């Protein structure tokens, strides 16, 4: 969990140049469900948060998607 928290803070400070595997590792550490339905996106959901977030699985992940993921993790932590 500590490593995931450090990675999350690094994402918050610099949303550039992250891989989808990094987002998945942080999500799993915080108990967030990760779905790869076979398309080009990865879906992150959590039962206590109404809306999930979808991130394109191709690289590079645009900073807007990384920021949306960080906001989603923050909502999960507050719920």
Residue ranges with predicted function:
Residues 41-45:
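Minor-groove-contacting beta-hairpin "wing" of winged helix-turn-helix DNA-binding domains
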Residues 2-36, 47-79:
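Basic nucleic-acid-binding interfaces
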């Amino acid at each position: 969990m500590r490593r995931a928290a450090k990675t999350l803070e690094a994402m918050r400070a610099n949303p550039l140049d992250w891989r989808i595997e990094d987002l998945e590792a942080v999500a799993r550490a915080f108990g967030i469900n990760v779905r790869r339905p076979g398309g080009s996106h990865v879906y992150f959901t959590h039962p206590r948060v109404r809306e999930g977030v979808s991130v394109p699985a191709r690289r590079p992940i645009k900073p807007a998607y990384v920021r949306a993921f960080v906001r989603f993790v923050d909502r999960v932590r507050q719920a």
